[in-house]
Swiss-Prot record:
Protein name as annotated: Cysteine--tRNA ligase
Organism superkingdom: Bacteria
InterPro entries in the cross-refs: Cys-tRNA-ligase, Cys-tRNA-synt_Ia_DALR, Cys-tRNA/MSH_ligase, CysS_C, Rossmann-like_a/b/a_fold, tRNA-synt_1_cat_dom, tRNAsynth_Ia_anticodon-bd
Cofactor-binding details, from the entry: Binds 1 zinc ion per subunit.
Length: 457
């Protein structure tokens, strides 16, 4: 049985799908105006593992992760770069996909774009207007939070606490400071960049919050099982989604379970442009850090806890994965998913316990220690196959032993070093021969000298 912490009820609950034969989940995806940083990646990695677990336990799972491809930040990026919206979003959508693939994230079932669902958005706004939960003011359409009496159930914030400030837009056209925009009129930049649509309220574009309500409804219906995202989205974004969707569909629960992954800091400081400490996934990859190392580092801390990103986090992940890969030597790891090897039950049980990935990783370490002590080759092989298959379940050990340790090093270069070592030995320069052996070992190449004078690796 899967148990998940539900942010809405503030407790860990037994997960009971609305339809036991079809689990539905929605996760807020990227706003594509820049490349992904590690905070973005953490959310993707967490819900990627959840997706795999739910498929394992329940079979059919529909996972929707949206793309926000119209937003003030995107418009500003296009304007600053003297480009157009489509060029900006196309470029960053591809960059996002490339980066997430590099850290072994599988694709969701659907990945709708906001711009492709404007018709749904307009219909939802019309419905909210007709039911008295929204109003027009100065060519804008706003949601009336006082019309929804359960506002604040997710975040704990009440309507009388919402005063104009950093997270509440100051606007005298609103009935209440906490009212949020569903539709905004086009301005000069919108017309210049063609970032507007026709609507019953004039030319304009949707607000951010209504986009997710419309897309989740379009792909999952009015009720679904899990809504996920980063803790930074809990308020106001997710709170506003609930208000919109439950107001639009009387009797709807919208999302039954709400999940939020924790904040990510860098050296105990919040990531921000002003501190120049934003860590991009692409920069890490370009520096030579493997995607799987990034993934392990993001998984090591429980998803609900804050994660502090340091150099030690990366070095520990690299060291651990090197150890894990050494155990896989000689196995056909790429095709092991089709083998008869079983995923560790303890490993799966850890994941079923509110996606306790750190506990699952600890079980992998226990399996590794046991493998190293085993002398029975048959039993050792069986446990090693289970170890690798378990690790692959959460997106680790996706490469072969040789690919992992020789990435970026050609076979020709390895053979050249072996030839140099052989020549050094023939000249009785054993110091150089040992240095070359150590050099090969550092890149994961273990060599054996044969009686006939040849060397294998």
């Amino acid at each position: 049985m899967v148990r998940l912490y539900n942010t809405l009820t503030k407790k860990k609950e037994l997960f009971i799908p609305i339809d036991k034969d079809h689990v539905k989940m929605y996760v807020c995806g990227p706003t594509v105006y820049d490349t992904a940083h590690i905070g973005n990646a953490r959310s993707v990695v967490v819900y990627d593992v959840l997706f795999q677990l739910l498929k394992f336990c329940y079979g059919k799972v529909t996972y929707v992760r949206n793309i926000t491809d119209i937003d003030d930040k995107i418009i500003n990026a296009a304007s600053e770069k003297n480009s157009n919206i489509e060029s900006i979003t196309t470029y960053y959508i591809k960059a996002f996909h490339d980066d997430m693939e590099s850290i072994n994230c599988k694709k969701p079932t659907y990945e709708p774009k906001a711009t492709e669902n404007v018709d749904y958005i307009i219909k939802l706004i019309e419905h909210l207007l007709q039911s008295g939960h929204a109003y027009e003011s100065d060519k804008h359409v706003y949601f009336n939070i006082e019309s929804y009496h359960e506002y604040g159930a997710l975040s704990g914030k009440k309507t009388d606490e919402l005063v104009p400030g950093s997270r509440v837009e100051v606007n005298e056209n609103k009935k209440h400071p906490g009212d949020f925009v569903l539709w905004k009129p086009a301005n000069d930049i919108d017309y210049k960049l063609s970032s507007y649509w026709n609507s019953p309220w004039g030319e304009g574009r949707p607000g951010w919050h209504i986009e997710c309500s419309a897309m989740s409804y379009a792909y999952l219906g009015k009720d679904f099982d899990i809504h996920g995202g980063g803790i930074d989205l809990q308020f106001p974004h997710h709170e506003n989604e609930i208000a919109q969707s439950k107001s639009a569909f009387a009797g709807s629960m919208f999302a039954k379970y709400w999940m939020h992954n924790g904040f990510l800091t860098v050296n105990e400081e919040k990531m921000s442009k002003s501190l120049f400490n934003i860590v991009k996934v692409r920069d890490l990859l370009d520096s030579g850090i493997k995607g799987e190392v990034i993934r392990y580092a993001l998984l090591k801390t429980h998803y609900r806890k804050p994660l502090d990103w340091t150099e030690n986090v990366i070095s520990d992940a690299q060291e651990t994965l090197n150890k894990f890969y050494r155990l896989s030597r000689g196995l056909d790891t790429i095709n092991i998913d089709e083998s008869n090897a079983e995923i560790s039950k303890d490993f799966i049980d850890a994941l079923k316990n509110d996606l306790n990935i750190p506990e699952a990783l600890a079980i992998l370490h226990e399996m590794a220690a046991k493998i190293n002590k085993m002398s029975n080759e048959s039993e050792k092989l069986k446990l090693t196959e289970s170890f690798v298959k378990s690790a692959r379940f959460i997106g680790l050990l996706e490469s072969s032993y040789q690919e992992w340790f020789t990435a970026g090093v050609s076979h020709q270069e390895i053979e050249r070093l072996i030839d140099l070592r052989r020549a050094a030995k023939q000249n009785k320069d054993y110091n150089t021969a040992d240095k070359i052996r150590d050099q090969l070992k550092q890149i994961g190449v273990t060599i054996s000298d044969n009686e006939d004078g040849t060397t294998t690796w």
